[in-house]
UniProtKB/Swiss-Prot annotation:
Catalytic function, reaction form: [[Fe-S] cluster scaffold protein carrying a second [4Fe-4S](2+) cluster] + N(6)-octanoyl-L-lysyl-[protein] + 2 oxidized [2Fe-2S]-[ferredoxin] + 2 S-adenosyl-L-methionine + 4 H(+) = [[Fe-S] cluster scaffold protein] + N(6)-[(R)-dihydrolipoyl]-L-lysyl-[protein] + 4 Fe(3+) + 2 hydrogen sulfide + 2 5'-deoxyadenosine + 2 L-methionine + 2 reduced [2Fe-2S]-[ferredoxin]
Protein family (similarity comment): Belongs to the radical SAM superfamily. Lipoyl synthase family.
Name of this protein: Lipoyl synthase
Pathway stated in the Swiss-Prot or TrEMBL entry: Protein modification; protein lipoylation via endogenous pathway; protein N(6)-(lipoyl)lysine from octanoyl-[acyl-carrier-protein]: step 2/2
GO molecular function: 4 iron, 4 sulfur cluster binding; lipoate synthase activity; metal ion binding
Entry's localization field: Cytoplasm
Region of interest (Disordered), residue spans: 1-39
InterPro entries in the record: Aldolase_TIM, Elp3/MiaA/NifB-like_rSAM, Lipoyl_synth, rSAM
Keyword annotations of the record: 4Fe-4S, Cytoplasm, Iron, Iron-sulfur, Metal-binding, S-adenosyl-L-methionine, Transferase
Gene3D superfamilies: Aldolase class I
Enzyme Commission identifier(s): 2.8.1.8
Domain Radical SAM core: 85-303
Length: 350
């Protein structure tokens, strides 16, 4: 008699083989040998979220599964998945669910896909966006250092497919750094998107602790700077996690570095440790402190600063652009990088 039981779930930190035959580490970090079990401190009350559920949540979940799509909502254990999916929105993760990098804050599986790509993904993604009746879609992806251009051509093909199928949909692309390759960056920026994002993740001092060695603080700044210089009308965006040991002064210095290269939008959120194998939370940042930092960021000239304990780079991204039902407000200009305001798309999302 054959065994019809469900396969045993893979434990965090263990090696496993994906459906595509890729060997990967579950949740991105190998299991740590520890003499004593790690004790997780209770989260503050402001970090409690409702369990996901509801008909709209199930519909989005079904749509994602039927079109073989990966979502950063699932792969990164995002605390906002229930809210976003229940509102009929999702952030789609391109180029599979296995990342070639292993950042110590991230719960995405890590391994070497050895060039694997789903060639039907551009059309499947475009069809899924249409079926979900989205007005604003955030695309992100794993890092693909195994591909010659870091996956830029495939990424751009996905954006073009969405625009060809549903030209009214606003596209935000949260991309890898493409190892700083200018041609790869331009390929994505020229694909028809409205917002180009690359996350700095943390302050300069902590970058080597938090991110994969192949990433870099200056590298991310140069990627964002080149994207803005190449196509000034495209909005640039980045995200910073708090609670990793950064100081207030370092946060403000990071804001200054970002404004110096013309970054338009900044998101600030609380770092949450996804598994015991990842970096520990150093402190809980209060909603009041996030509000204070948002005010400072706006004073420094960001078009918008989305800040809060549960804010993630793609959390309710469409709302960032709702400015009194009039579309986008122009950011303060950076000397030498002034942009004709008429070139900035007015995204009325009502």
């Amino acid at each position: 008699m054959s065994d019809t039981s469900s396969p045993k779930p893979v434990a965090s930190g263990e090696k496993f083989r994906t459906a595509q035959g890729i060997t990967a580490i579950k949740d991105g970090q190998k299991r740590r040998a520890s003499a004593e079990p790690q004790v997780f401190e209770p989260k503050p009350k402001w970090l409690r979220v409702k369990a996901p559920g509801g008909s709209r949540f199930e519909a989005v979940k079904r749509n994602v599964g039927e079109h073989r799509l990966s979502t950063v909502c699932q792969e990164s254990h995002c605390p906002n998945m229930g809210e976003c999916w229940s509102n009929g929105t999702a952030t789609i993760m391109l180029m599979g669910s296995v990342c070639t990098r292993a950042c110590r804050f991230c719960a995405v599986d890590t391994g070497n896909p050895n060039g694997w790509l789903d060639l039907e993904e551009p059309q499947n993604t475009a069809k899924s966006v249409e079926l979900m009746a989205l007005r604003y879609i955030v695309l992100t992806s794993v890092d693909r250092d195994d591909l010659e251009d870091g996956g830029a051509s495939h990424y751009a093909a996905c954006v073009r497919a969405i625009k060809e199928n549903t030209p009214q949909v606003v596209v935000e692309a949260l991309t890898p750094d493409f190892d700083g390759d200018h041609q790869a960056i331009e390929r994505v920026v020229d694909s028809g998107l409205e917002v180009f994002a690359q996350n700095v993740e943390t302050v300069k001092r902590l970058t080597h602790v938090v991110r994969d060695p192949r990433a870099g603080y200056e590298k991310t700044l140069k990627v964002l700077e080149h994207a803005k210089k190449h196509r000034p009308q495209v909005l640039t965006k980045t995200s910073l996690m708090l609670g990793l040991g950064e100081t207030d002064e370092e946060i403000l210095e990071t804001m200054d570095d970002l404004r110096a290269i013309g970054v338009d939008i900044l998101t600030l959120g609380q770092y949450l440790q996804p598994t015991r194998n990842h970096l520990k939370v150093q402190r809980w940042v209060s909603p009041e402190e996030f509000n204070r930092l948002r005010d400072i960021g706006l004073e420094k000239g960001f078009m918008e600063v989305a800040a809060g304990p549960l804010v993630r780079s793609s959390y309710r991204a469409d709302r960032v652009f709702e400015k009194n039902n009039l579309g986008l407000a122009a950011p303060l200009p950076v000397p030498g990088q002034e942009v004709d305001a008429s070139l900035i798309p007015a995204l009325n999302l009502n």
